[in-house]
């Protein structure tokens, strides 16, 4: 009896609303523009000036790398031109006439940020920088879905007409991370380099990836700097329940881009997880049913309270407890009558349906009713025993 009373009191002690943890405060960011996204679903978890026109510096090389990987033969030998060998800025010290495999050029460009390697890639793929830039911009628009990016060189040295946004860079990086070769090079910490004039070991410039700024989960990254762009940084990280991409642009000091990145990653993996819309699921709404169109679609869920609804146009929207749309997925109307209850799947466990206050209150009332029935039965039994004694 005491146990039953304790259960009822416990149920009535729940506060109104979902008992899940509240979303923590958004990160404080010093850099002029920043964004953190779910690398798999693309959902924007936090953004600051994400659509503002910015200069990327060497983050440009992410675009050059994935373009080269997808459009070139990585085993091809590229001939280093005089102009490539004389490219200013960070280099891997290529010499005019040197023959270098395309993959090695991509490695030298991403790991050691070699501008000479980037120039050689562009000339090898498209003959000259002008043709390369035209083809690269078309590729970025058509393949990666970038809308506010225009590049005029392969390395990111300043040009007024060479610009992008934090949102586009995150979208680009997420696209590139789907490629295994890109992920391998992007996550390389050190690499033995044997060249015509330079035998050494090259190291990533990304301090979190290298371990100089310790931080759990970092799997890849790229640094950037020119006077006009200031410090820029791209970072990928992986945790049990989510993979993240963080971009920070235009910070005065290196410590700021790393602190901002840590804050973005902390916020992302503490508050969100990646789930999956199964190809077999059917979503009912206003007398219609919708499906994913036969595909398994990654989707991002807040770890605290969230709401899901389907709009009149068939978009599944996930909103956090403040009503902000975390992700919107276009569904396909299903003409069949079968309706299957939808439930998101996560890597850890299925997402639990929320009961809410009234659900808990109903359960409590049900148990309270049982308690009354048991109590009445016990009282009647005691009364019968007393009558027998008399």
Task: Enumerate the predicted regions with their spans.
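Positively charged n-region of N-terminal signal peptides that target proteins for export
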Residues: 1-4
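Bacterial N-terminal signal peptides
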Residues: 7-14
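Hydrophobic alpha-helical membrane context
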Residues: 14-15, 73, 272
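Active-site-adjacent loops and short helices of periplasmic peptidoglycan-processing enzymes
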Residues: 19-184
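Domain-terminus/edge residues, biased toward the C-terminal soluble/receptor-binding domains
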Residues: 146, 158-163, 167-390
